[in-house]
Amino acid sequence: MKILGISGSLRKGSHNTAALRAASEVAPDGVTIEIADISQIPLYNDDVRAQGYPPAVAHFREQIRAADALLFATAEYNYSISGVLKNAIDWASRPPEAPLTGKPAAVMGASMGLFGAARAQYHLRQIGVFLDLKFVNKPEVMIGTAQERFDAEGKLIHDPTRELIRKLVVSLVEWTALLKR
C-alpha cells in the first residue's frame, strides 16, 4: 500500500515533516510513505489553472492520484492549517478529476505548544468534508511540546508518541482496505 504524506510546514526543521518520517519508520510491512514536496506549488490562481496546471501542481496531483491513502501532518497557524497546506489542497481539489475526492486520509499534527495542532486538525477535517476525503477517526495524534519529543536532527525520541503514530498508520491502512472492498 502506498501512502502519500503531506506536511503543512515548509520549515527545514519541521516537527510535522519529522512526524511523517517517523510514520514511515513504523509503517507495517508492505506499506510505503512518500512525503510530498509542496514547496514549489505556486499560489492558487484560477486564471493560471485555466491555462493548464503548473508542473509542480501537476506532479502533486499525480502523487495523490497514485497513492492509496493520504497522511497529513499539519502545523497550526492562528487556529487553522497553514496557508501552504490550504494552497496545496486548493490546487488538488480542482477539476477535472479532482484527485482528493473519496481518498482515505488521516491527520496528525505537532506544535511547540500544548495542544498538538488540535484546532488545525479539526479545521482540516472540516475542509475534508467538502472535498469528500474519508478521514480515519481514531486515534487522534496531537503532538504537543514537540521540541521535547524530537531531537535536534528531527528524530522522534518519545516512545509513546511513536506508538500512537504507529497506531494511526495501522488504522489508516485498515480503513483504506475497508473502503476498497
What function would you assign to each model-found segment?
Residues 6-7, 36, 108:
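Short hydrophobic segments within beta-strands
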Residues 52-132:
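Helix-loop-strand module that forms the ligand-binding subsite of alpha/beta enzymes
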Residues 1-30:
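N-terminal beta1-alpha1 ligand-phosphate binding loop
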